[in-house]
Amino acid sequence: MSLTLVLFLIGILGFVFNRKNIILMLISIEIMLLSITFLILVSSINLDDIIGQTYAIYIIVVAGAESAIGLAILVAFYRLRGSIAIEYK
């Protein structure tokens, strides 16, 4: 349980402190999502419940699709602007 909390906090801190780089922001979001998935998986194993384990697999599949869509948007953003840096005005 504490490992998932540490991973989630690392994801939040990475998202907050790397506001200029889109790739690091996507990685931070994935770390947060996978830490929650790990928490669900550990809880379902401790409770001997198969539904939590299937839900964790479902979350991992959705996270993979999310990563693919995010990277496709990133490629389109790079082609449009020539950079992946975010500029706040």
Swiss-Prot record:
PANTHER family: NADH-UBIQUINONE OXIDOREDUCTASE CHAIN 4L, NADH-UBIQUINONE OXIDOREDUCTASE SUBUNIT ND4L. The keyword Glycoprotein does not apply. Its main location: mitochondrion. The chain crosses the membrane at residues 1-21, 22-42, 57-77. It is a multi-pass membrane protein. The gene is ND4L. The keyword Transmembrane applies. It comes from Hypocrea jecorina (Trichoderma reesei). Core subunit of the mitochondrial membrane respiratory chain NADH dehydrogenase (Complex I) that is believed to belong to the minimal assembly required for catalysis. Complex I functions in the transfer of electrons from NADH to the respiratory chain. The immediate electron acceptor for the enzyme is believed to be ubiquinone. It is found in: Mitochondrion membrane. This is NADH-ubiquinone oxidoreductase chain 4L. Coiled coil: none annotated.
